[in-house]
Amino acid sequence: MATSNNPRKFSEKIALHNQKQAEETAAFEEVMKDLSLTRAARLQLQKSQYLQLGPSRGQYYGGSLPNVNQIGSGTMDLPFQTPFQSSGLDTSRTTRHHGLVDRVYRERGRLGSPHRRPLSVDKHGRQADSCPYGTMYLSPPADTSWRRTNSDSALHQSTMTPTQPESFSSGSQDVHQKRVLLLTVPGMEETTSEADKNLSKQAWDTKKTGSRPKSCEVPGINIFPSADQENTTALIPATHNTGGSLPDLTNIHFPSPLPTPLDPEEPTFPALSSSSSTGNLAANLTHLGIGGAGQGMSTPGSSPQHRPAGVSPLSLSTEARRQQASPTLSPLSPITQAVAMDALSLEQQLPYAFFTQAGSQQPPPQPQPPPPPPPASQQPPPPPPPQAPVRLPPGGPLLPSASLTRGPQPPPLAVTVPSSLPQSPPENPGQPSMGIDIASAPALQQYRTSAGSPANQSPTSPVSNQGFSPGSSPQHTSTLGSVFGDAYYEQQMAARQANALSHQLEQFNMMENAISSSSLYSPGSTLNYSQAAMMGLTGSHGSLPDSQQLGYASHSGIPNIILTVTGESPPSLSKELTSSLAGVGDVSFDSDSQFPLDELKIDPLTLDGLHMLNDPDMVLADPATEDTFRMDRL
């Protein structure tokens, strides 16, 4: 009996010991949980304070340090909420688990065999048997996973959403995350973020801290809240919207690859489009399509289109721009832009700009059929071209197509210079002059001679330089004059030869665009187009404003140069080109002294070349076509 009883006694003692240990462990865990909760609450409060202070302060100062002034006011409520909410959840869990543990051990003391008790204690010692994980892991893991979920910058922005107070449930946060992503992606981010911040701020004022994941509370992220958000985002939500594990650049005012505004209507984008066109294809397309095309198009239909584009620009800045421009471009624009999109990848939007420009410039005769639909919306711009109308006659359709391509800007194509002025004016007062200025002195002079539009001459150059990158506009001006002149062309040729392959590809894309849009180009315009294609097709940079300049912009073998200058000089260049081509006649390239083919090494267009330009179905893969558009032939 003694021996038989001893094991039971030992087992009972062991069970009691284990139970005591479990209880002690549970109590210890509870204490630790409370401590961790308080710490977490403190951290959250601190982080929230940092976020609140950081956003509010960062908005003005952009510093990551908390704003001591706001610590007292905004964060007083949060500490209580966070501890209570999180502690309430965790406490209930811990008490539940502890009760389970106690019950389990008691039951086991009664029922379980000596072996099971220690095993149960060892395995589940910190939890009820039903709980697969230790109690210490139950509530914290959920919290950690939840925090992890929110660690995403997207989730951080999700905290911005008013629903975030429910962030304790990971599912709700996921939903919020998605919402936040949708909100952040659109080009309207700033406005939506502002409104969302205001709304979510209200919701978050009390619940931010509790609901916001700790990861979202990282104070360092608060550096990025935009200054304008400070008032609204003094609360954490703004910081969440702006910051997360990754900073939300949308709130920052320094441009992201795709400009945050994505709104072509913003005056800054014209400058961005011209200056940054060289840098970013997508950004250029966004800036150009949104900034440049948007500029031209914003007036007629681009602003509506812009918003859609603004939303899509992130993924399809070029596409969005295409869509924006396409309404104006109509058939031509979609084709040219669609092809241009590919070309853009090759030539940084060069093809696109070219097609837009070429399409707008060259389409006149060909585009006449396509332009009619777009012209309806864009033909008003053609009137501004009256200055260049003489040039425009061939460009008359051109104006429609240009207007189609550009909306307001297409007129510059048709008008070349004058249109660009009207284009810019819809966009920005400065831009019209910008567009004119692109041609600047040389281009303007040429344009004056060819188009004889005085308005384009002086006003454009100063403003256009300002509107678009001033440096580039001078370049474009020189490009216009020089492109027609031998020296600049030679420079471009050097760059072109260096980029011959890429340019050839660009040319192909551009030619495809030109071919697809060749119908847009009239035979004369085709000549212009071929000239532009031969000269600037490759060089046509992805600047919609430059589209008109296409010939010249493409003239510059260097799309980047043109891109920088594109915003400003291309209008003048395109104006000059169009005006010269239109005014001198589509075939003027061959005979026009302004465009000495010999100096430019541009062979006169042959019937085949014209046919290729005019044939929308023409396949550029044809070696003859390739030959026609070879860089060396430029």
From Swiss-Prot:
Molecular functions per Gene Ontology = cAMP response element binding protein binding; transcription coactivator activity
Residue ranges with Polar residues bias: 151-174, 271-283, 296-305, 314-331, 446-479
Q: Which organism is it from?
A: Homo sapiens (Human)
Q: Which gene encodes it?
A: CRTC1
| Keywords on record | Activator, Biological rhythms, Chromosomal rearrangement, Cytoplasm, Host-virus interaction, Nucleus, Phosphoprotein, Transcription, Transcription regulation
Has the keyword Nucleotide-binding been applied to this entry? no
GO BP terms: namely: cellular response to cAMP; energy homeostasis; entrainment of circadian clock by photoperiod; memory; negative regulation of membrane hyperpolarization; positive regulation of CREB transcription factor activity; positive regulation of transcription by RNA polymerase II; protein homotetramerization
Q: Which interval of the chain is the signal sequence?
A: none
This chain's protein is named: CREB-regulated transcription coactivator 1
Q: Where is this region: Disordered?
A: 110-174, 191-221, 258-331, 357-479
Q: In which tissues is it expressed?
A: Highly expressed in adult and fetal brain. Located to specific regions such as the prefrontal cortex and cerebellum. Very low expression in other tissues such as heart, spleen, lung, skeletal muscle, salivary gland, ovary and kidney.
* Chain ranges for the short sequence motif Nuclear export signal as given in the UniProt record: 242-258
Q: Where is the composition biased (Pro residues)?
A: 362-397
Please give the residue positions where the record annotates the modification Phosphothreonine: T149, T161
Q: Where is this site: Required for ubiquitination and degradation?
A: K575
Comp. bias (Basic and acidic residues): 194-208
Q: Where in the cell is it found?
A: Cytoplasm; Nucleus
Name the disease. A chromosomal aberration involving CRTC1 is found in mucoepidermoid carcinomas, benign Warthin tumors and clear cell hidradenomas. Translocation t(11;19)(q21;p13) with MAML2. The fusion protein consists of the N-terminus of CRTC1 joined to the C-terminus of MAML2. The reciprocal fusion protein consisting of the N-terminus of MAML2 joined to the C-terminus of CRTC1 has been detected in a small number of mucoepidermoid carcinomas.
